[in-house]
C-alpha cells in the first residue's frame, strides 16, 4: 500500500477574508482525508473496529503557503509514522492541486487513540487495525 492519497475539494466557504483557505478549514481537509483512510479503506480491509471510536489526542499543523480555492481538488497524502499498542501517528502532506509535483501548502501530524465509546476509555488496536495501518507505514512502498 504505502502512501494513502485522498483528493479533497476545498469549498468556496473555506476561504477567509484574506482570500485563502482558513487555517481551521485546513484541519477539516485533513479530517476528511483521514476519515477516507481509516473508515473507508479500513472497513474495506477488515479494520472495521475503527468505526466504533477514534479520538485525536494531538494535532500539529505547519502552514507553508496559502491555499486558494480555485475549483480543483487538493492532494492529501497520509502515512503512518508510528504504530503503538494503543495509538498511532499519521503524517500528512497537503498539495495545492492533485499532482504530487504541486506545491506543498501544509504538513501535519495527528496522534490518534482508539476509543471504546461504551466503556468511555481508550483501547488497544485490534490485530486487523494494526495489520491495516502497517501497510501505510512511512517507508513502505506501494506494490
Regions found by a protein language model. Give the residues of each.
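Hydrophobic beta-strand-centered segment that forms part of the acyl-chain substrate-binding groove
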Residues: 37-75, 79-82, 86-88, 105
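Hot-dog-fold acyl-thioester-processing enzymes
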Residues: 1-58, 117-143
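HotDog/MaoC-like acyl-thioester-processing domains
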Residues: 6, 68-72, 81-143
